């Protein structure tokens, strides 16, 4: 999508109209914020390109021009999450110097760095992209020529424009920058750090302008009326945000419709179901001696507190069936005893005759005694009852005739009546034991749980639960559990288990690191280039690397692992290789790995030959020949860069003083200068390996290695060279690929084609291709969203392909 959007921006932005002013609040004056002045070590205030601002000479290498933490943070606050800004500087760089103008980096991550190489005559912009990858844009240009230049590089989303001396030199489509710099990020001026990238020359007006087309502050006559790519990206982003809102709203509406459909078919009022009875929300009822209320679908009960009723004459408090508290009931007084309504009394005369009385309307009335059934037990086991003239046998089941024992109260037969008693573990709520409640032995201290246990109350009893790390001996006691001995611990397989009181500790074995439950092998020197530490000080290296720490690249070319086509040369890369077409050949566009797609260049047909006018160019496989027509006396001269070079003439290239060319019978032959280190006048710029001075040595970026002048090495996908004490690094050249989806494998530097778009991290985005997500919402290419119904599944639309993956860090944070 970046590529398509960038093309749109380039086509859309036709420059026309007049310039506008610049808001000073959007300008970051680096020199002013760093408070550079005469007292700053390593720099000297000098005459600049103009007199309106200070200019500084950067010459000494014993300098440390770095913004303080507070000043750097103030600058970063203006830059964070910005995708539209311009770096401007007016400078006069010493010839052949390779130095950093401005560097914003954290550890090894360069968020924004601008450097100019006088060794390779190019300007480089290093930045961190939105995909969190390091990117480098190289612009061939001689900036280090000891002349004044006004330089600006404007970034607008994926659109980059470079102006030098108010002339547009380059315009490119790039990946969007990522300027969310973390705390602790450093800002350096005129150097990368304390030992590398020293700029030599004069700088003036070093600024960052956080606005569209900020180059206008340096070159006010340039036009800036056109909307920028960032404007367009912002519009697309808003569309994507609205699209996401639409998707979420649609999902909510769908869920609401489903719920409404279910609501139409059911009664949704909350209720409580207790003992087969249904009670509505907030409805109250009596359950024995407890008052209950249905609250939020749950029955909540509390024990009633009964107060003695104040009864009138002829009434007395008594329990009523189905009621917890006593109520006033009518009474009768008979033979000095009090009887309640319906209560009976059997009276025996001296002759043994039984008369039955019953309390009715405050009066004991004689009633007819029912006929007594014959008893099937001996006379000695007959039991006389107070409320009946009929006797019963000993052991008669009074409970079966009815009782008022409720809940946790049970009925018990006595010799002449039935009574209620509470079950074990319960206590009476009233004196007749008709209602009982559970005794909480734990809170009342009526349990027998011993040390290392926790008392848990249960209905009618309690239980003793062992504390963590202990095992049960019996119902009331526990003993310490050795999880280590029983292999019931949580230690990693590479950890040692130590038993403790009530638990255990895990400690990683020597050679492993972690918290004990998760131990990982530790390699003292680390595993480089994507290697994995699989055992103490043992690295498993990815393909293409070897060594104890995977520090050595396998040269597939010299080791004979690769056989390139005869028309190609094998070029080694970190972790990989490619077959590059030899001089005289070019790729036909198929970009085959082994060089089979290399084909001959017809120098004669394309005009890329050096034959003079008196000879005839004849194409050869991988080259050409200048042939003299039969019977004609040819000079053998050559044509080079529009000039005639005589046969046998030798010259040095104008833009490369280290290359020597010669004309040999119409053919121009160029080679690097032969270095004779014994010659005291040898050019040390072209032959740095002949420089024996210690001051010409270079320190490796890690600070652990020293290189001699002329040495080369590869560091972070860059080819580096030590040249007279200065380190200059440039991106490794990658073979061209032609595919829709590609990926840069870990520890490698160049992209490879892949067929699965979900594996790709580099995509030729096509804005016309869309995806339909799980809620049937159309998504643009490049958009991302959290999958419906999940919290940690991120989905992306990649050229019509929907790719979803789970974020492990998100899962850990849930």
Swiss-Prot record:
Family matches, as SMART domains: EGF (SM00181), EGF_CA (SM00179), LamG (SM00282), TSPN (SM00210), VWC (SM00214), VWC_out (SM00215)
GO terms, molecular function: calcium ion binding; heparin binding; protein kinase C binding
Range of residues in the leader sequence: 1-19
Segments forming a coiled coil: none
Binding sites annotated in the UniProt record for Ca(2+): 438-439, 441, 457-458, 461, 553-554, 556, 572-573, 576, 600-601, 603, 619-620, 623
Chief localisation class: secreted
Keyword Repeat in annotation: yes
Domain Laminin G-like, first and last residues per copy: 53-226
Purpose: May regulate neuronal differentiation, polarization and axon guidance.
Name the record gives this protein: Protein kinase C-binding protein NELL2
Natural source organism: Xenopus laevis (African clawed frog)
Gene name linked to the record: nell2.L
């Amino acid at each position: 999508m970046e590529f398509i959007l960038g093309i749109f921006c380039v086509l859309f932005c036709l420059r026309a109209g007049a310039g506008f002013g610049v808001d000073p609040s959007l300008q970051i004056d680096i020199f002013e914020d760093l408070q550079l002045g005469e007292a700053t070590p390593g720099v000297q205030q000098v005459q600049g390109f103009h007199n309106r601002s200070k200019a500084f000479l950067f010459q000494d290498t014993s300098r440390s021009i770095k913004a303080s933490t507070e000043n750097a943070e103030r600058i970063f606050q203006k830059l964070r999450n910005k995708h539209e800004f311009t770096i401007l500087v007016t400078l006069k760089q010493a010839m052949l110097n390779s130095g950093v103008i401005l560097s914003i980096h954290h550890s090894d991550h360069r968020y924004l760095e601008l450097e100019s190489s006088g060794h390779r005559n190019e300007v480089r912009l290093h930045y961190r992209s939105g995909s969190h990858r390091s990117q480098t844009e190289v612009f061939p240009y001689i900036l280090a020529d000891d002349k004044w230049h006004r330089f600006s590089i404007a970034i607008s989303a994926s659109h980059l424009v470079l102006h030098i001396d108010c002339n547009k030199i380059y315009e490119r489509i790039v990946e969007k920058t990522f300027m969310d710099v973390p705390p602790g990020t450093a800002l350096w001026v005129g150097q990368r750090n304390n030992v590398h990238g020293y700029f030599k020359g004069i700088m003036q007006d070093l600024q960052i302008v956080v606005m569209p087309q900020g180059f206008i502050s340096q070159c006010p006559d340039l036009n800036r009326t056109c909307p920028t790519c960032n404007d367009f990206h912002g519009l697309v982003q808003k569309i994507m945000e609205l699209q996401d809102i639409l998707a979420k709203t649609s999902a909510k509406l769908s869920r609401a419709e489903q719920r409404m459909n279910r609501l139409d078919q059911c009664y949704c009022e909350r209720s409580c179901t207790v003992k087969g009875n249904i009670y509505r929300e907030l409805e109250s009822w009596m359950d024995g001696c407890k008052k209950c209320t249905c609250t939020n679908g749950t029955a909540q009960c509390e024990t009633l507190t009964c107060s003695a009723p104040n009864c009138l004459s002829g009434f007395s408090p008594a329990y009523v069936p189905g009621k917890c508290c006593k109520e006033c009931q009518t009474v009768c007084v008979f033979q000095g005893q009090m009887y309640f309504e319906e209560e009976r009394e059997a009276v025996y005369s001296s002759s043994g005759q039984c008369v039955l009385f019953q309390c009715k309307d405050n009066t004991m009335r004689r009633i007819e005694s029912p006929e007594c059934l014959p008893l099937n037990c001996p006379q000695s086991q007959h039991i006389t009852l107070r409320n009946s003239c009929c006797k019963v046998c000993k052991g008669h089941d009074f409970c079966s005739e009815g009782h008022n024992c409720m809940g946790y109260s049970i009925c018990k037969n006595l010799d002449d009546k039935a009574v209620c008693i509470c079950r074990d573990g319960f206590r009476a709520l009233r004196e007749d034991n008709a209602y009982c409640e559970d005794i909480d032995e734990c809170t009342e201290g009526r349990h027998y749980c011993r040390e290392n246990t926790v008392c848990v109350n249960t209905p009618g009893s309690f239980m003793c639960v062992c504390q963590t790390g202990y095992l049960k001996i019996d119902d009331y006691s526990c003993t310490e559990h050795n999880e280590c001995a029983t292999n019931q611990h949580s230690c990693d397989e590479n950890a040692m288990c130590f038993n403790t009181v009530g638990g255990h500790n895990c400690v990683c074995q020597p050679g492993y690191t972690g918290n004990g439950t998760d131990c990982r092998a530790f390699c003292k020197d680390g595993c480089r280039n994507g290697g994995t530490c699989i055992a103490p000080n043992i690295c498993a290296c990815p393909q293409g690397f070897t060594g104890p720490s995977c520090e050595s690249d396998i040269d597939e070319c010299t080791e004979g692992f690769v056989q390139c086509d005869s028309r190609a040369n094998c070029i080694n890369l970190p972790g990989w290789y490619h077959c590059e077409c030899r001089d005289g050949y070019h790729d036909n566009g198929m970009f085959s790995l082994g060089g089979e797609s290399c084909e001959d260049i017809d120098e004669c047909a394309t005009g890329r030959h050096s034959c003079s006018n008196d000879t005839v160019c004849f194409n050869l496989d991988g080259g050409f020949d200048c042939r003299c027509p039969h019977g004609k006396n040819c000079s053998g001269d050559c044509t080079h860069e529009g000039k005639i070079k005589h046969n046998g003439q030798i010259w040095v290239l104008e833009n490369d003083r280290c290359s020597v060319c010669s004309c040999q019978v119409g053919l121009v032959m160029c080679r690097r200068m032969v270095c004779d280190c014994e010659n005291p006048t040898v050019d040390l710029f072209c032959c740095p390996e002949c420089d024996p001075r210690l001051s010409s040595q270079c320190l490796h970026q890690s600070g652990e290695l020293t290189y001699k002048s002329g040495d080369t090495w590869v560091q972070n996908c860059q080819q580096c060279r030590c040249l007279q004490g200065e380190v200059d690094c440039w991106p490794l050249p990658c073979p061209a690929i032609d595919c829709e989806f590609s990926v840069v494998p870990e520890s490698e530097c160049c992209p490879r084609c892949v067929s699965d778009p979900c594996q790709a991290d580099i995509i030729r985005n096509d804005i016309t291709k869309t995806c339909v997500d799980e809620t049937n919402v159309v998504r643009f290419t490049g958009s991302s969203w959290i999958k419906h119904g999940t919290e940690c599944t991120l989905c992306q639309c990649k050229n019509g392909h929907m790719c979803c993956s789970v974020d492990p860090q998100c899962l850990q944070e849930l």
